[in-house]
């Protein structure tokens, strides 16, 4: 992911001289954290999970080959653990409810995207392409809702989910109308909504992130 590479470059560029190489155990702990977060997010395939984790690590002195082998093993362990945990989940999770809400909104002309682009700025810049594609298929579009990759990570870490929203028509009133429609669909699906109708605020959904894995 581009934003991960940028973070990695900053980390390397800002690093102070090291008086001791990082221990392998320390790097493996850090590696496990990145892998577990992407795995539990539920949108990234196995190869990308490993690649993303290695991109943000200082690979020396242990080398990429060594850490990649450990990363594969860690991913297998974390996947088995997550499948075991998910067996005890309720039949309907908060993420299932989110998907129900998004599906309902799509029928109402609100284009909804999950884990969409690296950040909010890129999401707002690129959602127009998704709207255009929907219009080309003959569907009506009044607005959009999405959360980006960093939002997914925050949700996995227990911070709930934040949604961007907007309208195809300019101005505050159309955007707020779309926001209210989104909030209503989320509540109908059984999710709590923390949003006071302020145009300058994103919609917060204080959910428990439980997304079933395809791995």
Q: Where would I find each of the regions flagged by the language model?
A:
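Intrinsic disorder/low-complexity detector
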Residues: 1-137, 180, 211-215
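A short linear-motif detector with a strong N-terminal bias
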Residues: 89-92, 139-144, 171, 182-184
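Aromatic-enriched hydrophobic runs in primary sequence
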Residues: 118, 147, 151-153, 169-174
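Acidic, proline/glycine-rich low-complexity IDRs
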Residues: 2-11, 15-19, 158-215
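Generic detection of intrinsically disordered/low-complexity segments and helix-coil linkers/edges
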Residues: 28, 138-141, 189, 203
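An N-terminal amphipathic alpha-helical segment
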Residues: 123-162
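Short, conserved helix/loop micro-motifs enriched in His/Cys and acidic residues
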Residues: 74-84, 155-169
